[in-house]
Amino acid sequence: MLTLKIFVYTVVIFFVSLFIFGFLSSDTGRNPKRKDIE
């Protein structure tokens, strides 16, 4: 059961980080001053 919980937490953290990364990249897309991140 512990392995399942660790797996679920890993998937949740993965999707949350994907969402945050997509939000930040779309934010830099609208902000022309932050082109150096690419």
Curated annotation (Swiss-Prot):
Record's protein name: Photosystem II reaction center protein I
Record's function text: One of the components of the core complex of photosystem II (PSII), required for its stability and/or assembly. PSII is a light-driven water:plastoquinone oxidoreductase that uses light energy to abstract electrons from H(2)O, generating O(2) and a proton gradient subsequently used for ATP formation. It consists of a core antenna complex that captures photons, and an electron transfer chain that converts photonic excitation into a charge separation.
Topology in membrane: Single-pass membrane protein
GO biological process: photosynthesis
Localisation per UniProt entry: Plastid, Chloroplast thylakoid membrane
Primary gene name: psbI
Oligomeric form and interacting partners: PSII is composed of 1 copy each of membrane proteins PsbA, PsbB, PsbC, PsbD, PsbE, PsbF, PsbH, PsbI, PsbJ, PsbK, PsbL, PsbM, PsbT, PsbX, PsbY, PsbZ, Psb30/Ycf12, at least 3 peripheral proteins of the oxygen-evolving complex and a large number of cofactors. It forms dimeric complexes.
Keywords carried by this UniProt record: Chloroplast, Membrane, Photosynthesis, Photosystem II, Plastid, Reaction center, Thylakoid, Transmembrane, Transmembrane helix
Domain of life: Eukaryota
GO CC annotation: chloroplast thylakoid membrane; photosystem II reaction center
Key word Membrane present: yes
Family of this protein: Belongs to the PsbI family.
S-S bridge residues: none
Transmembrane segments: 6-26
Keyword Lipid metabolism: no
